[in-house]
């Protein structure tokens, strides 16, 4: 798989969350001032999840945002088919990789709301095992998603997922054990327990940086 020129400009190949202006790793938590945002500011985290790890990441992002005194709502797109963006000042979209691509619910949501996402402050995060040591593939998944949806977010986070062996059925547990043996990054083939590779500090930096870029008076709410 090849990475698009647009994505190469956004990511520098390092593990983590990236600043599109300079394509450098953001390595510190920002000291945000809550007074920058109106009490009416509301952020949506819309996500697709298969085994629950992306949902946990979305909830963590929502908690970080709420800790700054801003309203945040995390919604599973599978259960929110007719979701309207009218009441939000910013949107973060997230999905995870299964069978080599992000969930169709996520792609459908982005395609349907692309014009709104391009007007509002928005960002995308991708959850995959590839983000734990195989950044070339992690970036390629996002490039493919961009090509599929036509959306080129100004901020992208690449987060490592989890191996939830105890949640898998016998066949999937067996297949995942075989797959991880061939993957870089030191993924565990120990099926007796689950293995979470998500860097929660990285997730917090992603949320903090999104808020740092959000200027309420410039947020273009979509009028019905």
Language model region names:
Residues 9, 13-16, 28:
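Residue-identity detector for glycine
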Residues 2-10:
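Extreme N-terminal basic, low-complexity initiation segments
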Residues 35, 64, 68, 99-224:
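FMN-binding flavodoxin-like domain, especially the glycine-rich phosphate-binding loop
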Residues 18, 24, 30-120, 205-224:
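N-terminal beta1-alpha1-beta2 submodule of the flavodoxin-like/Rossmannoid cofactor-binding fold
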């Amino acid at each position: 798989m090849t990475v698009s020129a647009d994505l190469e400009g956004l990511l520098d190949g390092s593990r983590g969350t990236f600043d599109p202006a300079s394509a450098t790793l953001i390595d510190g938590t920002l000291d945000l001032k809550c007074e920058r945002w109106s009490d009416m500011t509301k952020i949506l985290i819309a996500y697709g999840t298969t085994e629950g790890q992306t949902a946990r990441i979305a909830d963590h992002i929502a908690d970080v945002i709420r800790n700054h005194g801003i309203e945040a709502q995390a919604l599973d797109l599978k259960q929110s088919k007719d979701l309207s963006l009218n009441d939000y000042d910013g949107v973060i979209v997230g999905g995870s990789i299964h069978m080599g691509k992000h969930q169709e619910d996520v792609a459908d949501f982005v395609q349907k709301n692309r014009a709104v996402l391009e007007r509002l402050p928005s960002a995308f995060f991708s959850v995959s095992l590839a983000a734990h040591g195989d950044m070339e593939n992690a970036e390629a998944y996002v490039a493919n998603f961009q090509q599929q949806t036509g959306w080129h977010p100004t901020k992208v986070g690449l987060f490592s997922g989890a191996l939830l062996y105890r949640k898998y059925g016998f066949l999937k547990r067996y297949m995942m054990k075989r797959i991880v043996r061939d993957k870089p990054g030191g993924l565990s083939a120990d099926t007796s327990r689950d293995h979470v590779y998500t860097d929660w500090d990285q997730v917090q930096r992603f949320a903090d940086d999104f808020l740092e870029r959000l200027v309420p008076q410039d947020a273009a709410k979509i009028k019905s």
